[in-house]
């Protein structure tokens, strides 16, 4: 039983070390990247734009 506990602990240490090493890679392109807004109006703005083009039946809410 003691050997099994040691084996499980060693496996856990190896896995956590592997995760730390993989997550520690330097990614300069991501670090210096400027976030861009692909949808300037946002999701609701896009939805409202579709409603305006298709003829919105709810005039008070369509703007």
Swiss-Prot record:
Keywords: Amidation, D-amino acid, Disulfide bond, Hydroxylation, Ion channel impairing toxin, Neurotoxin, Secreted, Signal, Toxin. Residues 22-52 are annotated as: Disordered. It comes from the Eukaryota. The modification Cysteine amide is found at residue 62. Transmembrane segments: none annotated. The keyword Acyltransferase does not apply. The modification 4-hydroxyproline is found at residue 57. The modification D-tryptophan is found at residue 58. One of its GO terms (molecular function) is ion channel inhibitor activity. Pfam families: Conotoxin. GO terms for cellular component: extracellular region. Residues 24-54 form a propeptide. It is found in: Secreted. Expressed by the venom duct. Residues 1-23 form the signal peptide. Residues 23-40 have a biased composition (Basic and acidic residues). Disulfide bonds join 56-62. Its target is unknown, but this toxin may modulate voltage-activated calcium channels (Cav) or calcium-dependent potassium channels (KCa). Belongs to the O2 superfamily. Contryphan family. Exists in two forms, due to cis-trans isomerization at 56-Cys-hydroxyPro-57. The cis conformation is the major form. The cysteine framework is C-C. This is Contryphan-Mi.
